[in-house]
Amino acid sequence: MSVESVKKIFEDNNLPLKVEETEGDTATVKTAAATWGVEEDQIAKTMGYKLKSGEYILILTKGGARVDNKKFKDKFKEKATMIPHDEVLEATGHPIGGVCPFGLKRPLRVYLDKTLKEFEIVYPAGGSDHSAVKVPVDMLEGITQGEWVDVCKNPVPAE
């Protein structure tokens, strides 16, 4: 059902995007990158957060990025709290490992971390733990109605 909801949203909106499915596991950044033959940071990791108000939000980051608690608190005026595992499917309509900003069960605010802008193409999940969507980064804001933010930790420079 989840992959089908993603496919339907693309078809209904005449979007030139396709859900790619595989037998391989794509539930984690590492396995998704290996399956799709791309670098880990090109996997657009979708993380769900639950605000104190009870509202669920999604934040997309590059695969290796980590949310910076201070930046999150500055943006959302509260501590970062992930959606509890037992609420993910109900909140998004997608299972853990397949959460993406497309074909959601209900409208959710979507935030796109600036780390994604390092790439021309990224690969968010496609609604299951064995799917992905190849998406040009310059399309993300429009198709997700997302807001660009800076909530990830700055990378540590190589020595």
Regions found by a protein language model. Give the residues of each.
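Extended, low-hydrophobicity, polar/charged segments
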Residues: M1-E159
